[in-house]
Amino acid sequence: MKELKLIPPNDPRVQSAIAPFTDELLKEEGFKDRQELVDCMFLVMKKFGGIGLTCNQVGLPFNMFVAGGHEGIEKGMSFAMFNPMIVSVSKEKIRMKEGCLTYPFMFIDIERPQKCVFKFEDKDGNTKEAHLDGMMSRICQHEYDHIVGINFIENVSKLKLDMAKKKAMKQIKRMEEYRKFNQVLDKNQAWQS
């Protein structure tokens, strides 16, 4: 299976809209079929603790995302959407904190429609429609934004973004200190053995 890696937020591939997906392009990028791409995407998403991931977040030029697959969210419901389009959204909106694998440890309060309808192709190339509500609706809307070139940091004021960045940097620093502490601890335990 092909190994995919998250790319940094300043990479232009993360910040630009993606052309429609084609199976020919899939082969050019070294995947045997859609299922292999889906498997690779879910693997990366779960490795980093995500609940959604688009191809441009791993540097691939595919109009596709995966979402869900965690027991605690919509009973493990998951999607792999190729060439997704939002058909409709509800007037009712919900504000909630969102995170993003492209921006580790950053959480921003975002308002989105409570419900939405997506039209997409599945891994077999069949056209489907999904009526989504709640968390899965939010996840798929967030991933769709990536596909059309919108990053979630664009949906917030500069002040709120600066505050979120500051909190993220504190968390990253704490994680780094924890990692260093564990390395020292591991060396000390090895010495005592």
What are the functions of these language-model segments?
Residues M1-S193:
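Positively charged
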